[in-house]
Curated annotation (Swiss-Prot):
The gene is gcvPB. InterPro entries: GcvPB (IPR023012), GDC-P_C (IPR049316), GDC-P_N (IPR049315), GDC_P (IPR020581), PyrdxlP-dep_Trfase (IPR015424), PyrdxlP-dep_Trfase_major (IPR015421), PyrdxlP-dep_Trfase_small (IPR015422). Its cofactor is pyridoxal 5'-phosphate. It catalyses: N(6)-[(R)-lipoyl]-L-lysyl-[glycine-cleavage complex H protein] + glycine + H(+) = N(6)-[(R)-S(8)-aminomethyldihydrolipoyl]-L-lysyl-[glycine-cleavage complex H protein] + CO2. The glycine cleavage system catalyzes the degradation of glycine. The P protein binds the alpha-amino group of glycine through its pyridoxal phosphate cofactor; CO(2) is released and the remaining methylamine moiety is then transferred to the lipoamide cofactor of the H protein. PANTHER family: GLYCINE DEHYDROGENASE (DECARBOXYLATING), MITOCHONDRIAL (PTHR11773:SF1), GLYCINE DEHYDROGENASE, DECARBOXYLATING (PTHR11773). Belongs to the GcvP family. C-terminal subunit subfamily. The lineage of its organism: Archaea, Methanobacteriati, Methanobacteriota, Thermococci, Thermococcales. The modification N6-(pyridoxal phosphate)lysine is found at residue 273. Its EC number is 1.4.4.2. This is Probable glycine dehydrogenase (decarboxylating) subunit 2.
Length: 502
């Protein structure tokens, strides 16, 4: 049984002691006098923690022992593709010639960086069947917003301002309707049928002269391939709308079929999912957006282009109908470097194998867990890269909810799946093992879920009160949202006022 380390670890500011140092700045080779305007000078002392290097290393090592990541074990968050991040990615991304260049440098001095961005775009075009990409968006949701803004600009440019409705399936990621709403669209929800795919009759009834487009994930969030995608594309295009591809689940079809060949006009990708760049910590991520030829003039500026005559790469601002910038500078460059490293190492055959093993792992887990008491399997049985089980039978029969199952999994030293999503599945357990998980890990995960099922029906309280073996027990799920304390200064002020007691 798993037992997590537990340290009573203070904040790094609380460990600080005046005069302790972990780094000594080199002496300047000459006196540097900088005339800083008075209004820009600090009025108070810069409050930074003072610790020695050993103290810092021990502090963060202890914190890491109370954490869990993709390097710790299976991390099957559905629709997140938490695959292993190869360490060669980090080696390349932290190379001085990558890490120490500056975005304000003359483009003649960063030809290598521009070449990396240009080459990554060629890979993404080939993988998706798109004709042009922007690498600027910082994450999936930022990419979505970019895509729907392009849709909006396209319709306005064509004299169709009445196209203000964005169609979104009921199984969609929550960011889809949010991005559409931010771009000024009215969101129309399209229901799923009994197979877990889009209801074509409902889709046909929903389209009109007001339809701007349809945002679709394929495979969808149930892990089911939308096998009527060609007909879906025809319906949308006949109505004058555009088809938008949410690339969150590209890992399930990588190297097998391309969104552009299915009829999609715009795609966004999540490099931090499909192409092994790190998740978490608030970023950095990357959400490149690709478009078909007829939409390329709406992409954000600048693009990276190549001049064959001079043999140079350059930042191309000649994008006549551009929606403008969606992020400062040129995107999260180090993330782009990691993704290209992964692509070049894997190659075409390797990428195809990625999706094959991801699909195999998801279906292996599905078949091993299927039929276990308390878990039901909605929709089609054959899945792509992920599967959604429902713990609704368990809840009705024992009172043990999906949340309880997720918390109990932590006691086995395993990360919980995504829960309560998609919303169309009650008590959802959304499991995406990815291709980097071994058969032994899959077997252990299924056995843990079966063990939890047994406990739910024989000793439900042990599940309802879980986790028992982690450093932190059940947290207050809403406290951080209601009372965010995101800086040391905020925490110190609240503590001095007696408003926090920890």
């Amino acid at each position: 049984m798993f037992r997590q380390a537990k340290w009573d670890e203070p904040l790094i500011f609380e460990l600080s002691r005046p005069g302790r140092v972990g780094y000594t700045l080199p002496k300047p080779i000459e006196d540097i006098k900088v005339d800083i305007p008075e209004k820009l000078r600090r009025k108070s002392k810069l409050e930074l923690p003072e610790l020695s290097e050993p103290e810092i290393v021990k502090h963060y090592t202890r914190l890491s022992e109370m954490n869990y990541g993709v390097d710790s074990g299976i991390y099957p968050l559905g629709s997140c593709t938490m695959k292993y991040n190869p360490k060669i990615n980090e080696e390349i991304a932290t190379h001085p010639k990558v890490a120490y260049i500056h975005p304000y440098q003359d483009e003649r001095t960063v030809q290598g960086a521009l070449a990396i961005m240009w080459e990554l775009e060629q890979w993404l075009k080939e993988i998706t069947g798109m004709d042009r990409f922007t690498l600027q968006p910082a994450a999936g949701a930022n990419g979505e917003f970019t895509g729907v803004m392009i849709i909006r600009a396209y319709h306005l440019d064509n004299g169709e301002p009445q196209r203000n409705e964005m169609l979104v399936p009921d199984s969609a990621h929550g960011t889809n309707p949010a991005s559409a709403a931010m771009a000024g669209f009215k969101v129309i929800e399209i229901p799923s049928n009994e197979n877990g795919t889009i209801d074509l009759e409902a889709l046909e009834n929903a389209v009109s002269e007001r339809t701007a487009g349809l945002m679709l994930t394929n495979p969808n969030t149930l892990g089911i391939f939308e096998d009527e995608i060609v007909e879906i594309a025809k319906i949308i295009h006949k109505a004058g709308g555009l088809l938008y591809y949410d690339g969150a689940n590209l890992n399930g079809i990588l190297g097998k079929i391309r969104p552009g060949d299915m009829g999609f006009d715009i795609v966004h990708l999540n490099l931090h999912k499909t192409f092994s760049t790190p998740h978490g910590g608030g970023g950095p991520g990357a959400g490149p957006v690709g478009v078909k030829e007829f939409l390329k003039d709406y992409l954000p500026v600048p693009l990276v282009s190549y001049d064959e005559k001079s043999g140079r790469y350059y930042l191309d601002y000649n994008v006549p109908k551009s929606i403008g910038k969606v992020k400062e500078l040129y995107g999260n460059f180090a993330v782009l470097v990691r993704a290209l490293t992964y692509l070049k190492i894997m190659g075409r055959d390797g990428l195809r194998e990625v999706s094959e093993i991801a699909v195999l792992n998801a279906n292996y887990l599905t078949q091993k867990l299927k039929g276990t008491r308390g878990y039901s399997l909605p929709g089609k049985e054959l899945r792509k890269h992920e599967v959604v089980f429902s713990a609704e039978p368990m809840k009705k029969e024992t009172g043990v909810k999906a949340l309880d199952v997720a918390k109990r999994l932590l006691d086995f030293g395993m990360h919980a799946p995504t829960i309560y999503f998609p919303l169309i599945v009650h008590e959802a357990l959304m499991i995406e093992p990815t291709e980097t998980v071994s058969k032994e890990e899959l077997d252990a995960y299924v056995e843990a879920l079966k063990r939890i099922s047994e406990e739910a029906y024989t000793n439900p309280e042990i599940v309802k009160s879980a986790p028992h073996n982690t450093a932190v027990k059940r947290v207050d799920d809403v406290l951080a949202a209601k009372k965010p304390i995101v800086t040391w200064r905020m925490y110190k002020e609240l503590k001095e006022k007696g408003e926090v007691d920890y």
